[in-house]
């Protein structure tokens, strides 16, 4: 009962943030005002909470009200330099006290050397809620060799109950350490660099495994009252998310006093997080280059090729329960990082794939930005787990003209060549294979011709370069319409051929024959003057010009038209259609009238007007062209000039 009352009193003294942590830990709703959160926490306690929740309440209460191990009266120092030191701060006890009030494993400088500022800060020391030197180990950095520990991993702790906290540390250098740092100075560049460095690192206070570098939130570091530059903030991935710094070791060598008599102080300020504690450590390290790491990797030796062959056989072993079996594996000899041929093929022991990457490029990239992630499977591939594959070293030695290989079930390998390379190799043997294939083709063709002449057998030569199939074939010759072929006679389809009489479909009344005795034959001969004109262009021969003409009936001089049609030679085949171009003044359209054969113009009449129309018989045109006006009969002349008074458009 007393225990529950004590827990209730602890819950009543918690703040909003601590109540939210408690309710969230218990799986309850943690939203609301303080009195609502307090009511929920009391109901949780009244309902009988688990021992884990009770421990959480006590932990939150201890953080809320830390117990003091020293009081200001105990650590009052009226004048360190003039008055005797109190018994509690005797010289024998000072070396075991650090600035956060915890015993230290390494002796530190007396308090009088810290100055009056830190003497006034001594009363505000924290309690022993966290171990000063917990069993914390930080991950080993491949590019740094550890020379010494200046400050062992120590928890960041402060008696300040506020969110922003601050604590101070101090360390001193030995003469040997000062000499190591001074002798490693490199002033060749614009900056003064040191290969032996003083390195500050932060991590989480966890002992389960070696810890990675992890900065506390809102970290600020001052070394000897000078601000220390930290890595820049990373851009947030989402809106409203607080930006964070990339956690890396901090080089504070340029801010350290290289002296054996003057100590170095480090003031760390950060923002406290509920449920998380941090630790810091200071090391003396030596920086290494990628060349040194590559030499060390080679010194480890090359892995036996049989290990890789066993892995290949394991991957290609058929699973009896699976319907799909892998029969081969294709692996590239190009590095996935630089897309260049591998020189030192390596991969991590933790990787399950066979694909390797180049060790030189991998180490150089991590020297600029240490991530140590496998470029093939995106898993962690630390330097300590890298191995050089002996099987790939053999492949690179014997396969110099190929960038891809294929592993088989027995662990053997074969180069994978492109189609063009394979075709070039097979083309060199076409001298023998071509003769055999041509002989075989000839024998098959002769045998089929003797047995069945009507049946053709197509023999395909597989040794011919396939690139010829990809070439564009010449388009087949365009077929000429039989009705428009120059050698074929013009079709009479859709054309009405009439003798020397009036058309039965003509709407004009029959006219009596005109006496042509009074017409002088020399006059007609004048109209037979040949027109020497160039033929009509081919691209204009099939065009229909009637839509561009007006729909009214157009009358032309029939005598001139008939004479022009009779004068055109028979070898001009420019009129490919049965339409009549109603132009008399243009030489282009007069050429269209030179169509040969027995075709006739279709009978037409005006659609809108009531004018009379008639047809021109091609027979009369043929007679007038083939023989002459002098040999014509009077009836022929009358049929041309008397019966057909005018010609109208089809449209």
Curated annotation (Swiss-Prot):
Record's catalysed reaction(s): S-ubiquitinyl-[E2 ubiquitin-conjugating enzyme]-L-cysteine + [acceptor protein]-L-lysine = [E2 ubiquitin-conjugating enzyme]-L-cysteine + N(6)-ubiquitinyl-[acceptor protein]-L-lysine
Primary subcellular site in the record, as a coarse category: nucleus
Binding site for Zn(2+): 351, 353, 374, 377
Region (Disordered): 465-511, 600-630
Keyword RNA-binding: no
PANTHER family from the UniProt entry: E3 SUMO-PROTEIN LIGASE PIAS1, ZINC FINGER MIZ DOMAIN-CONTAINING PROTEIN
Gene3D superfamilies: PINIT domain (2.60.120.780), SAP domain (1.10.720.30), Zinc/RING finger domain, C3HC4 (zinc finger) (3.30.40.10)
SMART domains, per the entry: SAP
Gene: Pias1
Residues in SAP domain copies: 11-45
Region (Required for interaction with MSX1): 2-200
Swiss-Prot/TrEMBL Sequence repeat ranges: 520-523, 557-560, 598-601, 612-615
Compartment(s) where it occurs, according to its Swiss-Prot or TrEMBL record: Nucleus; Nucleus speckle; Nucleus, PML body; Cytoplasm, Cytoskeleton
Crosslinked residue numbers (Glycyl lysine isopeptide (Lys-Gly) (interchain with G-Cter in SUMO2)): 40, 46, 137, 238, 453, 493
Feature: compositional bias, Low complexity: 482-491, 605-621
Motif LXXLL motif: where in chain: 19-23
Residues found modified as N-acetylalanine: 2
Organism: Mus musculus
Domain (PINIT) ranges: 124-288
Record comment regarding domains: The LXXLL motif is a transcriptional coregulator signature. The SP-RING-type domain is required for promoting EKLF sumoylation.
Post-translational modification: Sumoylated.
Family per similarity comment: Belongs to the PIAS family.
Lineage of the organism: Eukaryota, Metazoa, Chordata, Craniata, Vertebrata
Chain spans, region 4 X 4 AA repeats of N-T-S-L: 520-615
Described function: Functions as an E3-type small ubiquitin-like modifier (SUMO) ligase, stabilizing the interaction between UBE2I and the substrate, and as a SUMO-tethering factor. Catalyzes sumoylation of various proteins, such as CEBPB, MRE11, MTA1, PTK2 and PML. Plays a crucial role as a transcriptional coregulation in various cellular pathways, including the STAT pathway, the p53 pathway and the steroid hormone signaling pathway. In vitro, binds A/T-rich DNA. The effects of this transcriptional coregulation, transactivation or silencing, may vary depending upon the biological context.
Cited InterPro entries: PINIT, PINIT_sf, SAP_dom, SAP_dom_sf, Znf_MIZ, Znf_RING/FYVE/PHD
Source domain of life: Eukaryota
Full protein name: E3 SUMO-protein ligase PIAS1
